[in-house]
Each structure stands twice: as C-alpha cells, then as structure tokens.
C-alpha cells in the first residue's frame, strides 16, 4: 500500500504518477504581480469580510489582472468531487451534504466584492438525485437577483447529459454556459475516466440549441498531439461552442498526471488562429490562460461576433474589449521573444 503525504492511501494511478518527479517550468511560465487600485480594494474587501474565491484558494496566477477588472470565480457544491480527473487538484470521494444556503452567500459575496462579472464552477455531485442541477441554477438566479449589473458564467459538470437536468440549469439564463472538454479522444478515458468525450459535446450542443452563449476549454501537455488538438477544436465548433480557451497543463502535485510536453507560445498562437478560421467568435490561448481568464471580455466579444446586443444592464462589459490580456500567447511572444523547444525536465 502506498500512502500520500497526508496519510491517505493512494489510488493505483496516483501511486504510478508519483514515480515521476515534479517538472521544472520553462521561462515563459511566469507572471508579474501588478497590484492596481481595483485589486487592492478587492483584496481588502475579501480579507475584511472573510469571503472565499477560487482565485485565492487555488493560487491562480492571474488573480491580479482579473481582480483589477472586477472579475472573480467561486467554487460551489463543497470541496469534494464525486469524480476524479487526473489533472484536477480538487479532492475526490464522498461529497459533503448539500448546503442550500450557499447560493445566497455566493450572491452576497459578489455584491460585497463589487464584481462586474462572476464565474461559478463547482464539483460534480453524482450523489444527488439532480446531480447538483438545482444548486448550479440557483446560484445564477441569486447572483442576478442581488446583482442585476453583474454577468454570470456557469461552468458546470455534464449532469450525465440528462435533458431534464440540463433544462433546470439552462433556464437560470447565465450569460455564458460553460462545460469543459479538456482533452482529446485518444487519451480522454485515461485523463477523465468518469466523463465521456461525446457526452460532453452533446451537453454543449444542447446549450447552444437552447440559445445560450457556450464555452469550453482544452488543456495541452497531457499527451495529445497538435493534430489531435485541431480535431478537438473542430468537434467543439461543430457542437456549437462560441468561446474557446486553450491552456498549458500545470501539475498540481506528484500524484497527478505527469506533464508530457511544454507547449511553446507559438503553438498557442497557431491554435488561436486556427480556431478563428473555424469560426469561433471568441478565443483566448496561452500557457497560463485559464478557462475563467478574461471571461467578461470573451462574453462581450462573442456577443458582438454573433450580432447580439449586450443588455443595457451589462453594457459596461463593452469596455472589457479593450482590456489587458497579459497571458495571451501573442503578448508573451512580444514580451519574451521567440521560444525554443523545451524538453520536460525535473526539479
């Protein structure tokens, strides 16, 4: 039996992963902390009121940029997921009991932080009859109720692609419905054993058919090829995905899937160009781009590309079209210059 540092018995896949040391990062995997006035105000509010965001608790490298623009992400449904993905740092196991007061608290946090755009994500809740559909929908409703000028992005699990559960979530009318595909078919089962590639595409297709702006994410560096990435992008576009984010996999701990390759900024630029050529209305691609990165900007961009007017109460999001995108690959190339192929090495 192999035991982790916290005394928990490792899963077989975790024990196998832990045989590979943590990888050393290439020079372009870095951020610069710029603490502007909006960030400092957000920080003071969060600290003073004991609020909780994914941004802080997951140590997101983009927190300074997003908070400066009054954007933040929240994790709902508890801290334990009923499924395990080999890249994800959220622990898996038996989830905690459903907290029906959580939607109100999240909505009040959004108000206290003065957010212009909020992303709501969470754990998978296969233990519940509705797989958490009510919770995901109610958080969106409460945020809209208490914060009519705040856009909401709902990043959800697949709810087993049950139409009646998806309907509950869709009817809450988030500005963006997001469901992340994450990887390519060949390695999907190994990386996300409790999910199904085609089922995830069907969930996105259902949201698109309902009339929602849709979004998904791809993580590179877990064993896929460039050609497979392009095919996955094509599958997402055919399913009706409006917004696409593409990012580099960064290994949370030694128990997670080893990094197979460092994807150069030039490849991220090429994927972004290919995505626009396929007809994606909005794309953000770069090593430290995360699925919620610059989400308000991407929503506004997608709305404009689809010929839709941004509602009057969210018209301030038009300003985000000119905001910063420090982690976009084109900006990294401007900052660091051309990159060299960097083999995976270990600390």
UniProtKB/Swiss-Prot annotation:
SUPFAM superfamilies: Radical SAM enzymes (SSF102114). Its main location: cytoplasm. Its cofactor is [4Fe-4S] cluster. Binds 2 [4Fe-4S] clusters per subunit. One cluster is coordinated with 3 cysteines and an exchangeable S-adenosyl-L-methionine. One of its GO terms (cellular component) is cytoplasm. SMART domains: Elp3 (SM00729). It catalyses: [[Fe-S] cluster scaffold protein carrying a second [4Fe-4S](2+) cluster] + N(6)-octanoyl-L-lysyl-[protein] + 2 oxidized [2Fe-2S]-[ferredoxin] + 2 S-adenosyl-L-methionine + 4 H(+) = [[Fe-S] cluster scaffold protein] + N(6)-[(R)-dihydrolipoyl]-L-lysyl-[protein] + 4 Fe(3+) + 2 hydrogen sulfide + 2 5'-deoxyadenosine + 2 L-methionine + 2 reduced [2Fe-2S]-[ferredoxin]. Keywords: 4Fe-4S, Cytoplasm, Iron, Iron-sulfur, Metal-binding, S-adenosyl-L-methionine, Transferase. It is found in: Cytoplasm. Its EC number is 2.8.1.8. [4Fe-4S] cluster 2 binds at residues 81, 85, 88. Pathway: Protein modification; protein lipoylation via endogenous pathway; protein N(6)-(lipoyl)lysine from octanoyl-[acyl-carrier-protein]: step 2/2. One of its GO terms (molecular function) is 4 iron, 4 sulfur cluster binding. It is an enzyme of class 2 (transferase). The keyword Kinase does not apply. Pfam families: LIAS_N, Radical_SAM. It comes from the Bacteria. [4Fe-4S] cluster 1 binds at residues 55, 60, 66, 292. Residues 67-281 form the Radical SAM core domain. Belongs to the radical SAM superfamily. Lipoyl synthase family. PANTHER family: LIPOYL SYNTHASE, LIPOYL SYNTHASE, MITOCHONDRIAL. NCBIfam families: lipA, PRK05481.1, PRK12928.1. This is Lipoyl synthase.
């Amino acid at each position: 039996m192999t035991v982790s540092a916290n005394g928990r018995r490792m899963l077989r896949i975790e024990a196998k992963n832990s045989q590979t040391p943590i990888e050393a990062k290439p020079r372009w995997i870095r951020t610069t902390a710029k603490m502007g006035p909006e960030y400092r105000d957000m920080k003071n509010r969060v600290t003073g009121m004991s609020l909780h965001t994914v941004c802080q608790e997951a140590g997101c490298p983009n927190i300074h940029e997003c908070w400066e623009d009054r954007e933040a992400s929240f994790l709902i449904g508890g801290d334990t997921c009923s499924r395990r993905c080999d890249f994800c740092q959220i622990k898996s196991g038996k989830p905690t009991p459903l907290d029906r007061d959580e939607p109100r608290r999240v909505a009040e946090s959004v108000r206290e932080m003065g957010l212009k755009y909020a992303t709501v994500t969470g754990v998978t809740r296969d233990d519940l009859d509705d797989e958490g559909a009510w919770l995901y929908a109610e958080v969106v409703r409460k945020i809209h109720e208490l914060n009519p000028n705040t856009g909401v992005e709902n990043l959800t699990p697949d709810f087993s692609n049950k139409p009646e559960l998806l309907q509950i979530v869709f009817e809450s009318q988030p500005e963006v419905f997001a469901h992340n595909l994450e990887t390519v078919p060949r390695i999907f089962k190994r990386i996300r054993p409790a999910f199904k590639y085609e089922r995830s595409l069907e969930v996105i297709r259902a949201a698109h058919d309902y009339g929602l702006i849709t979004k998904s994410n791809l993580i590179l560096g877990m064993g896929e090829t460039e050609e497979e990435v392009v095919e996955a992008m094509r599958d997402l576009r055919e399913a009706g995905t409006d917004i696409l984010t593409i990012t580099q996999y960064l290994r949370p701990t030694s128990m997670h899937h080893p990094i197979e390759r460092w994807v150069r900024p030039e490849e991220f630029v090429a994927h972004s160009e290919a995505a626009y050529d396929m007809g994606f209305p909005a794309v953000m691609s770069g090593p430290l781009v995360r699925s919620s990165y610059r989400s308000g900007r991407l929503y506004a961009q997608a709305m404009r590309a689809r010929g839709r007017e941004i509602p009057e109460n969210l018209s301030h999001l038009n300003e985000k079209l000119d905001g910063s995108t420090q982690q976009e690959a084109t900006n990294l190339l401007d900052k660091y210059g051309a990159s060299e192929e960097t083999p995976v090495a270990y600390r």
